[in-house]
Regions:
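Conserved N-terminal entry element of GNAT/NAT acetyltransferase domains
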Residues: 1-21, 168
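Active-site rim helix/loop that mediates acceptor-substrate recognition in acyltransferases
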Residues: 28-56, 65, 71
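Conserved beta-strand in the GNAT
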Residues: 53, 59-70, 74-75, 86, ...
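Conserved acetyl-CoA-binding loop-helix of GNAT-fold acetyltransferases
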Residues: 92, 98-111, 138
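Conserved active-site alpha-helix within GNAT-family acetyltransferase domains
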Residues: 103, 128-145
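Conserved GNAT acetyl-CoA-binding A-motif
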Residues: 113-125
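Conserved beta-strand-loop-alpha-helix junction that forms the acyl-donor binding cleft
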Residues: 123-133, 150-154
Length: 168
């Protein structure tokens, strides 16, 4: 039940737990996940990101990350600045999907970012990810901003569409 979900900004210890879980689940992408863990811990320490976690019965079941600085966002022009935040890493453990947990975390995150002075949020999605595009549209990300390419540490290249929404 979503009402029992604890929504919070993650601690460094919680980040390490979540990243180790993701690395263990990653399969053939393991090297990318190891690099992403190191990068995200450093970004957190520098104050460039805010990781938001949904915790149920002591377990991290969903997450999202707010990226606050252009240095940590690929194709950052128009996506992140002093009043615009870039959102990424929307993840929910499979067995908890479709039960309202991520929705509760998302609204917690948006409220927190609004209180921090952000007036717009942006995100990126691969055009082939129709389910994710539908979810993002449901959350109000309907303002098309641009397209671009993003690069994984292993050299994988992704086509990405970027969308925004005003934080009201």
């Amino acid at each position: 039940m979503a009402e029992f979900l604890i929504c919070k900004i993650a601690s460094l210890q919680e980040m390490n737990i979540k990243w180790e879980y993701e690395i263990a689940q990653s399969g053939k992408d393991k090297e990318n996940w190891i690099i992403w863990k190191k990068q995200n811990i450093e970004k957190y320490k520098q104050g460039y990101i805010i990781p938001y976690y949904g915790i149920l019965e002591g377990n991290i079941i969903c997450e999202a990350t707010a990226m606050l600085h252009p240095k940590v966002v690929q194709n950052s022009a128009g996506l992140v600045d002093g009043h615009t935040v870039y959102l990424s890493a929307f993840r929910t453990i499979d067995r908890f999907q479709g039960k309202g947990y991520f929705s509760k975390l998302f609204h917690f995150m948006i409220d927190d970012l609004r209180h921090k002075g952000f007036t717009k949020a942006t995100l990126g999605v691969e055009p082939v990810e129709e389910k994710n595009k539908d979810i993002y549209t449901h959350y109000g990300f309907t303002e098309f901003i641009k397209t671009g390419k993003e690069y994984y540490p292993d050299g994988t290249v992704l086509n990405v569409e970027y969308y925004g929404k005003t934080l009201e």
